[in-house]
UniProtKB/Swiss-Prot annotation:
Function: Catalyzes the NADPH-dependent reduction of 7-cyano-7-deazaguanine (preQ0) to 7-aminomethyl-7-deazaguanine (preQ1).
GO cellular component terms, semicolon-separated: cytoplasm
SUPFAM superfamilies the UniProt entry points to: Tetrahydrobiopterin biosynthesis enzymes-like
Active site annotation, chain numbering: C184, D191
GO molecular function, one term: preQ1 synthase activity
Catalytic activity: 7-aminomethyl-7-carbaguanine + 2 NADP(+) = 7-cyano-7-deazaguanine + 2 NADPH + 3 H(+)
Gene coding for it: queF
GO biological process, one term: queuosine biosynthetic process
Record bears the keyword NADP: yes
Protein name: NADPH-dependent 7-cyano-7-deazaguanine reductase
Organism field: Pseudomonas putida (strain ATCC 47054 / DSM 6125 / CFBP 8728 / NCIMB 11950 / KT2440)
Known partners and oligomeric status: Homodimer.
Binding residues annotated for substrate, in chain numbering: I83, E84, S85, H223, E224
Amino acid sequence: MHPAAEHSPLGKSSEYIATYSPEQLFPIPRTAKWAELGVTAQTLPWQGVDYWNCFELSWLLPSGKPVVAIGEFAIPADSPNIIESKSFKLYLNSLNQTVFTSLGALQVCLEKDLSAAAGKPVGVKVRTLAEVEAQGVVALPGQCIDALDVAISNYEQPQPELLRCNPERVVEETLHSHLLKSNCPVTGQPDWGSVVVQYKGRALDHASLLTYLISFRQHADFHEQCVERIYLDLKNLLQPEHLTVYARYVRRGGLDINPYRSTGPISPDNKRLVRQ
């Protein structure tokens, strides 16, 4: 478990406060997990963003009438902190009986509080239900590798030694899988995800990638660190000209988390998959 997470509200009984309470937000430094991967804030081998989508966002108009919406938050991948997910939920719930005079006032409040917790400016969009409904759901790009016939029996830790490639052949391709699963390092609850791998580099053996992703099944870590581990393991193997790893996790507690890590400019979309 991340030492800071032991003091977070995650996995503990909590009082749900219905009026504005920014102190609910609990930042967790990224540095400890980066150290496990052998990187520092000064040597990060990726650019990226963590998209958080909130489906339980509500507040009051000055008339007392409630409003509901969907919040989209973009936390830079090089921010000093992640925000612990239950504390994020408690903070958002604290807006439920809080009056905002306008959508702009709400957005300014969210940007201020979330940026303070993350340690870097956080992008905020508040979207109407009709807007999100019209967008619908999308399919992941590239080739799905889930139908490949693989065998695996060890799910306790990610196993990069399972990955194989052809060093004599360079390809550019996009692969995806819906079989990513890990566990919350605090509560042990399952985190279900889909992941896209886009790269140009040594030809990756598709079956070995699928087996490697499945090896995360009982691994305990936060969403962001799982994606960073996948990114680094693939980068070390493929020596790619470019590499992107983008995971879209299933919603829990009204929030879904979608980490994106890439060698190139940050350009992901934030469109829902069928399980989101």
